[in-house]
Amino acid sequence: MKDKLVKAIAKDGQVRIIGAITTELVNEGVRLHNCAPTAAAALGRMLTAGALMGTTLKSEKDTLTLQIHGGGIAKGVVVTSYADGHVKGYIGNPTADIEPNSKGKLDVSGIIGKNGNLLVIRDMGLKEPYIGQVPIYTGEIGEDLAYYYTVSEQTPSAVGLGVLVDKDLSIKSAGGFIIQMMPGADEMLADLISYRLEEIPSITEMISKGMTIEEILEYIFEDMDLNILESIVPEYRCDCSREKVERALASIGQKDLKEIYDEVKEEELKCHFCNKAYAFSHDEIGNILESYYNEK
């Protein structure tokens, strides 16, 4: 099933929905970072959440960054997303892996940890970005985001995120949804949706059966006048470049850069998001010193 993200409403706008299949997107992120199974599930859930939330941005220049740091062996997960559905991310420890939890599922909470915070950072080109922060609720990511929306944005929300890792460590299925009750929505409607979400199969199970994201949402919102508003293709895409890495190298400061120039013949930097390596020769480091600090 091809990746697809849709935005929809139900019950005459009382409910706002963003849903997506993200199997290929997550597969690419997991491949780039060579993740162990539990790390793959954690990164995949965050990438899916980022893709969903990024589409709420107003401008293509805006960015949304999700960070979760719970003190666990995952060493944090960071994802940055954009309005057009493209997303990038990394996990601090891609080899993080532990035994399944009591339900036989990959123990994402176990590697994330619960001693920390979930941050949502919206950079809309203003002087300061908007930063929302809540304590980690369960470490399962979906429940943490639902808690964030309810506490930080006062929007009752249900967030479902799923990643099914195959035996060969590829991603068999991945996807998710964010369901939000709009101001003035019928409380009984919220109860009905909550009941349905408890009764349905997992989103990865539905994707594995070949259901499209539209069919999944139709199944959840049967008899609720689901109205699909728009659709896009979410994608894992890193926008790193040699120029950006050069600026990052220059930003460490004149003193540290001079030490590198004096001590090494070559400096290699890797992009956090895609692991692409950029090598700078001794002469190139000297040129950076000269162009940024008029020193060599």
UniProtKB/Swiss-Prot annotation:
- What Pfam families is this protein classified in? HSP33 (PF01430)
The known PTMs are summarized as: Under oxidizing conditions two disulfide bonds are formed involving the reactive cysteines. Under reducing conditions zinc is bound to the reactive cysteines and the protein is inactive.
- InterPro entries named in the record: Heat_shock_Hsp33, Heat_shock_Hsp33_C, Heat_shock_Hsp33_N
Q: What is this protein called?
A: 33 kDa chaperonin
Give UniProt keywords alphabetically: Chaperone, Cytoplasm, Disulfide bond, Redox-active center, Zinc
- Give the protein family: Belongs to the HSP33 family.
Summarizing the function annotation, the protein's role is: Redox regulated molecular chaperone. Protects both thermally unfolding and oxidatively damaged proteins from irreversible aggregation. Plays an important role in the bacterial defense system toward oxidative stress.
- Which Gene Ontology terms cover its molecular function? protein folding chaperone; unfolded protein binding
**Family annotation (NCBIfam families):** PRK00114.1
Which HAMAP family does the protein's record reference? HslO (MF_00117)
Return the Gene3D superfamilies for the record: Hsp33 domain (3.55.30.10), HSP33 redox switch-like (3.90.1280.10)
Q: Where in the cell is it found?
A: Cytoplasm
- What biological-process GO terms show up in the record? protein refolding
User: Which Cys-Cys disulfides exist here?
Assistant: 238-240, 271-274
Q: What SUPFAM superfamilies does the entry give?
A: Hsp33 domain, HSP33 redox switch-like
User: What is one GO cellular-component annotation here?
Assistant: cytoplasm
Q: Does the keyword Transferase apply?
A: no
Name where it mostly resides: cytoplasm
